[in-house]
Amino acid sequence: MTVTTRFAPSPTGHLHVGNVRTALHNWLWARKHGGRFLLRIDDTDVERSKEDYVAGIRADLAWLGLDIDAEERQSARFALYEAEFEKLKAAGRVYACYETPDELEVRRKILLSRGLPPVYERKPADAPVPEGVAPHWRFRLDHDAPIEWTDLIRGPQHFEPTTMSDPVVRRADGSWLYLLPSVIDDIAMGISHVVRGEDHVSNTAAQVQMFAALGASPPAFAHEALLVGTEGKLSKRLGSLGMASLREQGIEPIALAALLARLGTSDPVEPVTDLAPLVASIDFARFGRAPARFDEAELALLNQKILHHIDHAAVADRLPAAIDEARWKAIRPNLTTVAEAADWLPVFDGPFVPTATEAADRPVLRAAAKAALDIDWSADPWHALTAAVKEATGAKGRALFLPLRRALTGRDHGPDMAELLPLIAKEAAIARLTSAGGS
């Protein structure tokens, strides 16, 4: 059996961190098992589906590095749904219903007021059919067939169909709801594993019987705990936190993937620089049922750690041309986003205005300007410079290093000066030291 997973978003909005996590886990599982990862655009809602959102979905997956093996569109498969629907109708597994939404709501409230579950009550076969009313269609659950499956995350699952309403699968206008087309496509596309949020568990219960009614075995299911915010609650922000927003914040795609791959497990989140370790470690048996906490502060910190190790080639297309590999390696330990690299261009190439210096520091700076004239800039100039200044002035520790850093970079903190100074032209460094030292 070829492991085949699918990510099936509706193109009615932008992706957010919750459904991106689902896409990632489907992709990781397929790649771990040498299988296929499909993108299925669930665009049965023709009115609300937009091509701009489809393009955005593709772009977001590409940004994350999640390559797809095939793309399908539900809107191109209506003929297949119609044919399978007719088979179910002939077998008595779908039936027409004529209640209005208001009538159904009244019935629901009555049942709840009696302390009863609001389960849809089937009408007798000989119930009169109202004239001029187009029916909607429900799937008839088999009340004599308990629904069971072993979830890869939640373990054994059991549902009694007598406690469930027959689900609506087709509206009165002929349009399709989610449940039945999804099952038909999963069968036709050979989906072996369905990985999705735990809010789909009740859908799965109904779909298990749909698979059987269509003569197919259901795939394996893995229902993930939903993402919550740092306070342990569902967050509107998480529902709207899209990839564009994260890109604007300077989040690296591998940082987001590294965090989302491990959320919900007890495994540590590690600052990996490619997807391979995440592929190797994906294991649904390690996922728990407790809500998975998504912390933007944790993501930002992870992003920073990853930047400290990421290769120049991985970010070169987003760097100023003047930030070559040597400069990148020097400054990356001090960056929180790639965009901050541009802030270091004046340090390397100017124009540069040194910070005001204190009188007590000027002897150190004048000695440094003089010593720099005779230093070989290609052979560890920082250690040669500090040694010469220390010998000439007796300065050491903070009194030696901080004035030099300020004069050369205009900052109190930053990269290792032993790595940074060789990347500043000798003439520029001498000019800065001379200016800061005064007369």
UniProtKB/Swiss-Prot annotation:
The record's listing under Gene3D superfamilies reads: 1.10.10.350, HUPs (3.40.50.620)
Q: Which domain of life is it from?
A: Bacteria
Q: What is this protein called?
A: Glutamate--tRNA ligase 2
Family stated for the protein in its record: Belongs to the class-I aminoacyl-tRNA synthetase family. Glutamate--tRNA ligase type 1 subfamily.
Role played: Catalyzes the attachment of glutamate to tRNA(Glu) in a two-step reaction: glutamate is first activated by ATP to form Glu-AMP and then transferred to the acceptor end of tRNA(Glu).
Question: What gene, per UniProt, encodes this protein?
Answer: gltX2
Keywords of this entry: Aminoacyl-tRNA synthetase, ATP-binding, Cytoplasm, Ligase, Nucleotide-binding, Protein biosynthesis
Which HAMAP family does the entry link to? Glu_tRNA_synth_type1
